[in-house]
Amino acid sequence: MHLALYRKYRSATFDEVISQEHITTTLKNQIKAGTPAHAYLFTGSRGTGKTTCAKLMAKAVNCLSPVDGNPCGECESCKAIAAGCPDIIEMDAASNNGVDDVRALRDEVMYAPTVCRYKVYIIDEVHMLSSQAFNALLKTIEEPPPHVIFILATTEI
């Protein structure tokens, strides 16, 4: 059976991400300083590590004992995220691109995280959202509650 490399191997730390040092250094510095932004936009071709960096960032901002900006992988939060913590929400905008999908997400944003410090919404292929869906999401992205971080990933600008 053929497995894509990104499915077989996904970096566990920012240091393991290949050819994105300028990005991973910036993200690690934000973790070390304790100043994560409320929203990020990751752009690039397929296979450049957008989703990997988004998942690492979700883990790192919630890690209780980060190591040089990397998630430790051993604390309660890291283990919960690895096990599928409900505070890390990944949405494939290619499949969930309607205004009703975004409204459901927007309603969910107001609830505090259950396990982690932050709820992180990773919206992959964000360019696939309909214009109505993106308009419904815009205000929430611009002014999210303090416990929410959005990471948008796209292959198009």
Predicted regions and their residues:
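P-loop/Walker A NTP-binding region and its immediately flanking N-terminal helices
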Residues: M1-I157
